[in-house]
Design a protein with these regions (language model features):
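Carbohydrate-interacting/catalytic domains
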Residues: 3-146
């Protein structure tokens, strides 16, 4: 038996106008009450929005051969909380470190990232040192080496 998913959905919140700019008619489902603050139009204007973050990630991937064609290597397969890997190509290296937990965690550094170029990060202060990498809850970094 298939159940409808209407309770899990709301109309797309495009802007601050009536019905969140989704329709000029009456929508089948009600619009979330936060549509005047949380909508696509506002997200596109905000450099700190999730929209802008993903736009930057997509641009990095499109314009960086290391991320497209580079050799992939996990940096610590056994770490229970941090997902860290590197991609290498033609003497260039990009290191990605992600903490998917709701608390601060750390791992032994596989290399010194202090002089690397930060391509993107989502929060916090850089605590990726020579001996250990410390990441806050849900923190992620992408750093270019060389």
């Amino acid at each position: 038996v298939y159940k409808r998913q209407d309770n899990a959905r709301t109309p797309m919140q495009w802007n601050h106008q009536e019905h969140a700019g989704f329709t000029t008619g009456t929508p089948w489902l009600s619009v979330n009450g936060n549509y005047k603050e949380i909508n696509v139009e506002n997200s596109r204007k905000n450099p700190d929005s999730l929209f802008s973050y993903y736009k930057t990630l997509i641009a990095l991937r499109k314009n960086n051969d290391v991320l497209i064609y580079g050799k992939f290597q996990l940096l610590d397969k056994e770490h229970p909380e941090i997902f860290a890997y590197e991609r290498t190509l033609d003497g260039k290296k990009i290191v990605v470190i992600c903490n998917f937990t709701d608390h601060e965690t750390q791992m032994e550094a596989t290399e010194d990232l202090t002089d690397g170029k930060i391509l993107i990060h989502n929060q916090g202060q850089n605590r990726l040192g020579k001996e250990k990498w410390i990441l806050g809850a849900y923190e992620a970094w992408m750093i270019e080496i060389g």
